[in-house]
């Protein structure tokens, strides 16, 4: 059961603007068991589910090499399964008009700050990866906690009307932090916490396996947000030195590919935080230049890249570093007891 708004008026500063509601009942994916009606053996469908494939959309995102690696699925069976899936989902060409129509299923989740929402074109977008990088205490994790709550708001209040999955690689998730944020939005804290599933990852392999296990949950329940805080930390620990850099980047690319597929398969917003490293080529006019960790592999995976930095007091500054549909601009926001909010003069 999703969290409900309290009857009393919210004490938050956010101006909630109503918008045309989205049909939450509309199927955004085809369940894998629909293959049975297409003549696929129920036992083979079960093998796909055991391998973490729960939708026909997700099936078509796997290579035949990966599928034939599933125990009990021969090349002939895989060909038949893929042929059946192609009848249920269209992974071919569509017109630009159809692509525009498909974009209408995208939800933009409020950050809690009107200025930050406007910078992002309405909020954090589903079916996309939003990366926030910056130094410690720049507001990345605070935004993650605020999104845990705002995602559960109704869509006509700029929420996602869905649940949240949180993968924590640095031990920074604080459930007690959720309570005042939920109260600020006029929501029941207990219900909000019940709609967040949380896992602490300790190795990069553990982090990847946690992602694999999400498909089963997301195919059954309405999730709208996946948080990975932070995406790079365990890779920097588990791989050391230039000798392991190529292997690290390959494993990182595999994990990022999985994040992209989750975002598009289930129409969820993926919000991941990233660390920064020194940039020797940053220029002589910049004091202590920094750049996001992860290299080109991470840069190409993120749909929207945001650079966070500290302002005066509790104020923080967010800059659009890279995005396909947003201009390079900045917004000032503030960290409050109730989460991310507009900055006070």
Curated annotation (Swiss-Prot):
SUPFAM superfamilies, per database record: P-loop containing nucleoside triphosphate hydrolases, Rad51 N-terminal domain-like
Record's GO cellular component terms: condensed nuclear chromosome
Binding locations of ATP: 134-141
NCBIfam families: PRK04301.1, recomb_DMC1
Record note on quaternary structure: Double stacked ring-shaped homooctamer.
Role description: May participate in meiotic recombination.
Name of the protein in question: Meiotic recombination protein DMC1 homolog
Organism: Glycine max
């Amino acid at each position: 059961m999703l969290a409900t708004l309290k009857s009393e008026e919210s004490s938050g500063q956010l101006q909630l603007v109503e918008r045309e509601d989205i049909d939450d009942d509309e199927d955004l994916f085809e369940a894998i068991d629909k293959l049975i009606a297409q003549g696929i053996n129920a036992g083979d469908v079960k093998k796909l589910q055991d391998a973490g494939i729960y939708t026909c959309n997700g099936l078509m995102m796997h290579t035949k090499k990966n599928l034939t690696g599933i125990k009990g699925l021969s090349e002939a069976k895989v060909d038949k399964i893929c042929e059946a899936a192609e009848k249920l989902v269209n992974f071919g060409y569509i017109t630009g008009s159809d692509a525009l129509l498909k974009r209408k299923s995208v939800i933009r989740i409020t950050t809690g700050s009107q200025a930050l929402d406007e910078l992002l074109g309405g909020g954090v977008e589903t079916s996309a990866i939003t990366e926030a990088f910056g130094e410690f205490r720049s507001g990345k994790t605070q935004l993650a906690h605020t999104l845990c709550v705002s995602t559960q708001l109704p869509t006509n209040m700029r929420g996602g009307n869905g649940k949240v999955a949180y993968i924590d690689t640095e031990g920074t998730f604080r459930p007690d932090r959720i309570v005042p944020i939920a109260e600020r939005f006029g929501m029941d804290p207990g219900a909000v916490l019940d709609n967040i599933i949380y896992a602490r990852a300790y190795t990069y392999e553990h982090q990847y396996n946690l992602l694999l296990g999400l498909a089963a949950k997301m195919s059954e329940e309405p999730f709208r947000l996946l948080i990975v805080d932070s995406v790079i930390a365990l890779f920097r620990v588990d791989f050391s030195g230039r000798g392991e850099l190529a292997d690290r980047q390959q494993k990182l690319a595999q994990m990022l590919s999985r994040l992209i597929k989750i975002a598009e398969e289930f129409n969820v917003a993926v919000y991941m935080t990233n660390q920064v490293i020194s940039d020797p080529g940053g220029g002589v006019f910049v004091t202590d230049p920094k750049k996001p960790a992860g290299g080109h592999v991470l840069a190409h995976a993120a749909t929207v890249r945001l650079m966070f930095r500290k302002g005066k007091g509790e104020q923080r500054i967010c800059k659009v570093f890279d995005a396909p549909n947003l201009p390079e601009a900045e917004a000032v926001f503030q960290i409050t007891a109730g989460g991310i909010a507009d900055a006070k003069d």
